[in-house]
């Protein structure tokens, strides 16, 4: 079963885009979307005041309420192999109850492996390979090495707790977190979605048609390249990020510490100011720069 929850650990909408791609390509029903085999009671988990669902106001009345849905769908990969997809908004509350409900699904459908997808914003350039953090509740499941050394204290998530609880209950679970350039974290970044699904293929032995995601990723990269070619100041910041990334990579290969490096690296504040303009240029017309890529 593949898990992708919206709301957290979804920089660049990587997990949400990946889930939508799976629904679109793995549906076995004529009307698309696959068969919903389990539905969670969202009222038990959702904080409507924190994440208000959109509604439509048509002149003098309300209509078109987009109710949040947290469901499990039966899908099929490119070779016809069946698998489940749990997707929807991350529960705001009652995480333990959510984990127990997922356990019921796992046992009811004899799920042998749960694979989660996520993404985090990182100070990395889009011109370098997307790094993936591998994690699992059973070390035998790991399909790659972790880029981290030692321990980190990080904010928890429902997906992370689910992996922990499933391990305690004797069920296998693993996941992948893509590192998305932080200046692209608010945009759809299909390149990260494709990287996540490539890892899902390896872990789950599914065959997923990634052609459409590849096309979308190439189009996004072309948009970014056009924007940077017309905005030298932002290009300079990306170049600084590349230098920072390569400095860390060299130090990692040589086993050196960066604490002794004399090379000045751009600060988060410096990058943030530049990337506010970057995001504005990609999302809409930039009056001060003569337009943005389409």
Where are these regions (language model features)?
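Predominant activation on well-ordered alpha-helical scaffold segments within soluble catalytic domains
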Residues: 16-23, 103, 160-163, 167, ...
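A conserved C-terminal secondary-structure "cap"
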Residues: 184-294
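N-terminal short beta-loop-beta anion/metal-coordinating cradle
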Residues: 2-88
